Amino acid sequence: MFLYYCKECFIMNKQQSKVRYSIRKVSIGILSISIGMFLALGMSNKAYADEIDKSKDFTRGYEQNVFAKSELNANKNTTKDKIKNEGAVKTSDTSLKLDNKSAISNGNEINQDIKISNTPKNSSQGNNLVINNNELTKEIKIANLEAQNSNQKKTNKVTNNYFGYYSFREAPKTQIYTVKKGDTLSAIALKYKTTVSNIQNTNNIANPNLIFIGQKLKVPMTPLVEPKPKTVSSNNKSNSNSSTLNYLKTLENRGWDFDGSYGWQCFDLVNVYWNHLYGHGLKGYGAKDIPYANNFNSEAKIYHNTPTFKAEPGDLVVFSGRFGGGYGHTAIVLNGDYDGKLMKFQSLDQNWNNGGWRKAEVAHKVVHNYENDMIFIRPFKKA
């Protein structure tokens, strides 16, 4: 009986152990599954996070790459523009005396060295921007060629071999007038082809009836009133022309440097002549400015060329900016009807063939065609 009881107990214990073992297995299985799901979820989140981080890195890298390329292109464009600007012909007062030893005959093109800066300054932000030196060198060469071609086109446009700058300053549009005893604004306005209100506004004058002796006023360059030249008989005119031609003959075959600068320029010859007549030279940044930069009120009369106009001995002729590289040209008329058809005239010129700036071309006779835009200045006084 005891043995049977023990056997039953053993069987029951064994069954209970199996049940506990099964419960333990189930628990372990559930725990394993939970841990596995947790780990899988964590890895998924980590992978997702890594993808986001990588995406951010990619976006940031893309933006940095685009920024670097933009900076590089900007620097290249800046360098190119800078080279083009620096490649322009430099206009300075001393460039008229360039070391150019070859004389240029009338009608030939002007050759001039063009200095191009090929050491541009590049700047970069940070250490991540790398500039390709080969590409930059290529850009510099392209810019150099473009600058040379641009300036060569400007050279080809010159229709005359008179040496001068390619860019030039316009003649001033106003001059300073000093108020004298008895002056009124209305009289000054009439004299300088303007209005009282214009002078008031230009000079900040509140009361047009109140100006002072010695007061400086800005007025237009060209005056309105031009005194009529004295009428002379044909005999006196012939004698005057003879005396003028005799004086001009003394200027021929000699070089004249009135201002001591830039050699024997055309302006120098004319200034020597005008100084002989009136005791002073003429103003003007270039020869073409002479009719506008001077007050010829009591010294000369200005004529614009027409089909019937005939220049007289002693007249100044002023060529437009189409000549002299933009500065014009000037000479003294010797014969106003050289061909008998009013198509040509003869004048005394200096530096017409571009040799005066190095003192290789003296004053000499030249025959010119009458040009539509020529201006002639006839002095009241004869030499």
Swiss-Prot record:
Keywords in alphabetical order:
Cell wall biogenesis/degradation, Hydrolase, Secreted, Signal
Respond yes or no to whether keyword NAD is given for this record. Answer: no
On whether Cytoplasm is a keyword of this UniProt record, the answer is no
Q: Where is the signal peptide?
A: 1-49
Where in this chain does the entry annotate a coiled-coil region?
Answer: none
EC category: hydrolase
Which EC number(s) are documented for this chain?
Answer: 3.-.-.-
Instruction: Report the transmembrane regions from the record.
Output: none
Q: Which GO terms describe its molecular function?
A: hydrolase activity; lytic endotransglycosylase activity
Which residue numbers delimit the Peptidase C51 domain?
241-378
The record's subcellular locations are: Secreted
> Residue limits of the LysM domain?
175-219
Q: Which GO terms describe its biological process?
A: cell wall organization
Quote the function comment for this protein. Probably involved in peptidoglycan hydrolysis.
Q: What is this protein called?
A: Probable cell wall hydrolase LytN
What is the native source organism of this protein?
Staphylococcus aureus (strain COL)
